[in-house]
Amino acid sequence: MRLTLSCLVVMLVASPALAFEGVMEASLSSEQGVAARVRARYSKQGDVRMDIHSVDEDGEPVRATTLMPSTGENYFSIDHGQRVIVEMPYSTLATTSKQVTGSGDNANLAIKKLGKATVSGVETRHIRVIDKDNRTVIDLWLTQKYPADLWTRAFRGRNLGLELSDDERSKAMKKYGVKPGFSMKMRVEQAGGVPVVFLVKKVQRAPVPPEVFALPEGYQRIDGPSAPQP
């Protein structure tokens, strides 16, 4: 199957931007309302913690965390309701990244530049990306104010069906004359699907205490799936 730009915002592997230390807060919503609230925190050493707050089918709150240390071979997915920590190797992410290498060269897109707009107090460039092969429309509101890889670094440990690495995304954007940037807002609409909107509420540079990136005590710790063997 040909890998495409179905979610240009992807979040697989990126080089840590060590200069950024602080927090990003965002929401994920659809026509039915806000589906999840996201809070990502970044250390100046390159550690990332992402917390997602949502509700289950019964309306009960659900809180999940992904911890991605800047050193070591593993990252951690934490289910606070079950009090479980799943330890997974970074090598699984590297394997997925190899599968998308080169996909930005073959992207069959139409690009529309729709002017400027202010999103959460930040001036942005509104770009519409139309994936002709998959009938997907992606609206991006881009800024140069923040590192472009903050989304990728926060989400790379979660399986969201997002397909391009930062390098491939940038390659595809540049091919069509668009300067890559940080997405303050993203709207993704696939043919026959429900539009989904990622909206950044706040990005703030601020010191983050080391204990934010520590694993919680008293949780059961289990091994997750290993990387497939070549």
Question: What is each stretch, according to the model?
Answer:
Residues 1-5:
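Positively charged n-region of N-terminal signal peptides that target proteins for export
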Residues 14-16:
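N-terminal signal peptide c-region/cleavage motif recognized by signal peptidases
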Residues 19-230:
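Extended soluble regions of mature proteins
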